[in-house]
A protein has these predicted regions:
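Rossmann-fold NAD(P)-binding glycine/threonine-rich loop
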Residues: 16-37, 132, 137-185
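Short, small-residue-enriched loops and turns at beta-alpha junctions
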Residues: 10-13, 124, 143
């Protein structure tokens, strides 16, 4: 009996069509249109694995998101957008930016944010762009093996790459699989 399906990425053509063929009961990475719709309607029990790992990191750090200013840089359906919906549902004030956001707007938003989630590309921010005591969660992984953060912040907390979000993402996939199994089987 097949109880979980994970699609290995990248897939270059018709990716969403493939995701939409997966039964919601077996969609461990929550990438179907139906899963996305549930998330947008406020159901944050299951998130795509990388977005879920960000949620797990935030919860394990005991961060109360209510009233916090958060910046999510990246709008992909598997990382940035689900993180945006999770943070919004958790009562943070969220700004969603991306690689096409004007750099001056991005820097201003980062300087004002208590929490910065990076998921859009390396070197968009510099040390002086980060608010003192901010928390930075780097979801990026680039060809050089590094994350989206090209510096080690002295005035903020951050997750390293490799070794930060990646291992938690693997655990989140397994947890999603077990939780879906217990919910539906």
């Amino acid at each position: 009996k097949i109880t979980s399906i994970v699609v290995s990425r990248p897939i270059f053509d018709n990716e969403q069509e493939l995701f939409d063929l997966i039964d919601l009961k077996k969609d461990v990475d929550m990438l179907s249109t139906l899963a996305a719709g549930r998330l947008m309607r406020g159901d944050i029990r299951f998130l795509p694995a990388t977005a879920g790992s960000v949620k797990n990191i935030i919860e394990n750090l005991n961060i109360n998101l209510t009233g916090k200013k958060a910046l999510v840089i990246g709008r992909s359906p598997s990382v940035g957008s689900p993180i945006f919906w999770y943070l919004q549902k958790s009562n943070a004030t969220v700004t969603l930016a991306h690689s096409k956001t004007k750099i001056e707007d991005l820097k201003k938003a980062a300087k004002d944010s208590d929490l910065v989630i990076l998921a859009a590309g390396v070197q968009l921010l510099k040390p002086e762009d980060i608010k003192e005591n901010a928390i930075i969660i780097d979801c990026g992984y680039n060809q050089d093996g590094q994350g989206d953060l090209s510096f080690i912040p002295e005035n903020a907390s951050y997750t390293p790459v490799p070794g930060g979000v990646g291992p938690v993402t693997t655990i989140t996939l397994i947890t999603n699989s077990l939780n879906l199994y217990h919910l539906f089987y």
